[in-house]
Amino acid sequence: MSFSQAVSGLNAAATNLDVIGNNIANSATYGFKSGTASFADMFAGSKVGLGVKVAGITQDFTDGTTTNTGRGLDVAISQNGFFRLVDSNGSVFYSRNGQFKLDENRNLVNMQGMQLTGYPATGTPPTIQQGANPAPITIPNTLMAAKSTTTASMQINLNSTDPVPSKTPFSVSDADSYNKKGTVTVYDSQGNAHDMNVYFVKTKDNEWAVYTHDSSDPAATAPTTASTTLKFNENGILESGGTVNITTGTINGATAATFSLSFLNSMQQNTGANNIVATNQNGYKPGDLVSYQINNDGTVVGNYSNEQEQVLGQIVLANFANNEGLASQGDNVWAATQASGVALLGTAGSGNFGKLTNGALEASNVDLSKELVNMIVAQRNYQSNAQTIKTQDQILNTLVNLR
């Protein structure tokens, strides 16, 4: 009789308890994937066998629960995909833990300082360069440059029953010489705001002269001729004159803004008071970075004090042919191996890649109730193998005491 079978059983049961204990210990670790010990019998030419061995430890890569945190740099993956990280030596690792922060160089890093990689954003305005080599994502604390207005719009409802003004000619300083005044604020090359006043003067039925004046420029000359004439049909629908090109004055040495002002969707109706429905334009002043977040498509976006946002990069995800072939490196990261296959890169929601949820984290997929039951079973297994050794010892004692 040999003790080897029971000893192998003790070793296997101890390993199983270690795996279960590791699962329980990491039940609150974001992005953790539970492990399972697999066993195989040892056979050496006899029907009895030589016991048991640990064949391997596999990981369960099913999704954990998505837990909302509300933090802008937290992001959870659901379904397929891993975050791609690089360490200080340039080695590449992969993780499901989406807890990120800024380091001293304003790189997005995980809690161990590994840099999150993605596609860069370049150009003016910045655009994502998908397909480029992934690089560490940085959130620069730089000023967002001003943008000169190139297009603007004003939607107005004009009252068809308004009389032609009694005062002529038109004057910006005489409210009796026009029917309605509106303002659209536009920006020049330095981000200086220009309040462009727009005056509407009824000249006859279904026709309105439009005058424009840059009230922010002290040197601006008051207009004496109309910039355009709005002509409506008998149903009050604008037929012509709905677009005019305007150039602002010059302030502080900036280049003047030349933009197209559209009155499309404006109407003439018997509606009571003349009404400016909406104004819009595409320029803005400079802005400081105020906040930043990761969106559900993986884009990293900065929010600026000028109420604009700017894309700073986009997270890349990695897929593998065989997730179980990844080698665990601790710190909640894995390394690619020959068994896992090479990493296939892409973005969230594209192809076979999973989805991202911003302001959330993927919880551990450990089923704590199941692991506690498994621990009891493993403990009984250990005790049973110990009892086998005890029984064999008693048999040997009996043999020794034979006379």
Swiss-Prot record:
Question: NCBIfam families under this entry?
Answer: FlgEFG_subfam, PRK05682.1-1
Q: Family assignment?
A: Belongs to the flagella basal body rod proteins family.
Give compartment(s).
Bacterial flagellum basal body
Which gene name does the record give?
flgE
Q: Organism source for this protein?
A: Salmonella typhimurium (strain LT2 / SGSC1412 / ATCC 700720)
- InterPro entries annotated for this entry? Falgellar_hook_FlgE_sf, Flag_bb_rod_N, Flagellar_basal_body_rod_CS, Flagellar_FlgE/F/G, Flg_bb/hook_C_dom, FlgE/F/G-like, FlgE_D2, LlgE_F_G-like_D1
Look up keyword Acyltransferase and say if it applies. no
Query: What biological-process GO terms show up in the record?
Result: bacterial-type flagellum-dependent swarming motility
GO cellular component, alphabetical, reads: bacterial-type flagellum; bacterial-type flagellum basal body; bacterial-type flagellum hook; cytosol
Give the protein name, as stated in the record.
Answer: Flagellar hook protein FlgE
Pfam families the UniProt entry points to: Flg_bb_rod, Flg_bbr_C, FlgE_D2, LlgE_F_G_D1
Please provide the record's keywords in A-Z order. Answer: Bacterial flagellum
